[in-house]
């Protein structure tokens, strides 16, 4: 699989022919410290954290709440995997076309899917469907989140990309912790989906704030150019 992946990357990924000199590490740190970059990293943590609030505990959700046999868990997770592939493809296409709408739409979709999953917990067929939708909705956010951070970190994309991967992993840990806290404090497995939905909802609110900052910055730039003319 690794050899195939390497061949595909070498064939399809465009070669960077730019001659731009890399920034010094100190300057890269200044770039990734920009408010828009930090907001993007926060969106990544919250966006993926919500999904892992549920996914970390997907086995007991399926067996203890939905009533599936243990042997059914692995086939159902294959449905999640198919959803991941579909979500990655769709998220990448949407992000390439219109990044800002793609970012907002994918976070909103993830919030909606997780919220509605609350009402599917006791229906086996509905749960299979929503497990697939969860995979698709969660991984549709990956490309928009990554591209948003890279665009806002112009000149320090390598460092920003590394930090964003770390943000995805931090989201994984945060989601697992949050799900465990929900269960430990007695809310039960059934509360994981709606509590988890609040996390990408908060990511969506951060995204809306980030977009408003971007629009304000664009207006100021246009005004400055008009005054200079």
Placement of each model-derived feature along the sequence:
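A membrane-interface helix-boundary motif in multi-pass transporters
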Residues: 1, 69, 181-201
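C-terminal membrane-cytosol helix-exit motif in multi-pass small-molecule transporters
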Residues: 1-19, 206-211
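Juxtamembrane intracellular "pre-TM" segments in multi-pass secondary transporters
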Residues: 10-43
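Intrinsic disorder in cytosolic terminal tails and internal cytosolic loops
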Residues: 23, 209-229
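Extracytoplasmic gate region of multi-pass secondary transporters
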Residues: 35-78, 82-85, 99
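Helix-to-loop junctions at the C-terminal end of transmembrane segments
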Residues: 86-99, 183-184
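C-terminal transmembrane helical hairpin of 12-TM major facilitator-type secondary transporters
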Residues: 99-145
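Paired intracellular helix-loop junctions of major facilitator superfamily
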Residues: 148-159
